[in-house]
């Protein structure tokens, strides 16, 4: 079975350069998981072990999941694939015209529903936290977080729920003023979808 890293490389989802991340940090590496998730067979494979662990935790009573949600854009296909493997429904949150994460398109969350949030990449967890805020304000309980790539650094905010990454990959993250690539005069590109 191919590993998550092999799938990321095979799909050309691991990019090298100077990137401005959605978190506002700079990095020499970017994970464009859409390149992997566009292939249904690869999406299935990258989440197989994640879903296996989730199912084990559900079976032992450590986790309860009623619905799967992902923050747009990166979490839409990821959440759908995990939900498919769990035989659950998948919905997504997205930013409204004011840039506020919200539940739209007629999607509903019911009080006391147990929600698994799924993302493509977790760097700071900001999108996951924004998604969780929307859901908990509607009375849902966040039961866990899953992702393709966990690229958090040691100083990142800790994840407060059970966490199921397909792979943990260390990548350099810098604040803009400390960015080694900026100091070298290399222009940054912003491939993500969130407006900073």
Question: Where is each model-derived feature located?
Answer:
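Short glycine-rich phosphate-binding loop at a beta-alpha junction
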Residues: 61-72
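Conserved acidic residues
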Residues: 66, 113, 143
């Amino acid at each position: 079975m191919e590993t998550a890293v092999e799938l990321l490389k095979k799909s050309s989802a691991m990019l090298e350069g100077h990137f401005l991340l959605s978190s506002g940090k700079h990095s020499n590496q970017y994970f464009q998981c859409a390149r992997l998730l566009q292939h249904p067979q690869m999406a299935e494979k990258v989440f197989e072990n994640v879903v296996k662990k989730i199912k084990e935790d559900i079976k032992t009573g450590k986790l309860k999941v009623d619905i799967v949600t992902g923050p747009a854009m990166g979490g839409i296909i990821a959440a759908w694939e995990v939900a498919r493997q769990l035989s659950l429904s998948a919905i997504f949150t997205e930013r409204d015209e004011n840039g506020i994460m919200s539940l739209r398109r007629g999607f509903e969350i019911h009080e006391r529903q147990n929600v698994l949030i799924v993302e493509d990449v977790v760097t700071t967890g900001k999108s996951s936290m924004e998604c969780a805020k929307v859901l908990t304000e509607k009375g849902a309980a966040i039961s866990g977080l899953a992702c393709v790539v966990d690229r958090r650094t040691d100083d990142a905010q800790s994840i407060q729920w059970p966490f199921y990454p397909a792979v943990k990959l260390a990548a350099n993250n810098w604040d803009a003023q400390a960015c080694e690539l900026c100091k070298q005069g290399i222009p940054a590109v912003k491939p993500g979808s969130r407006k900073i």
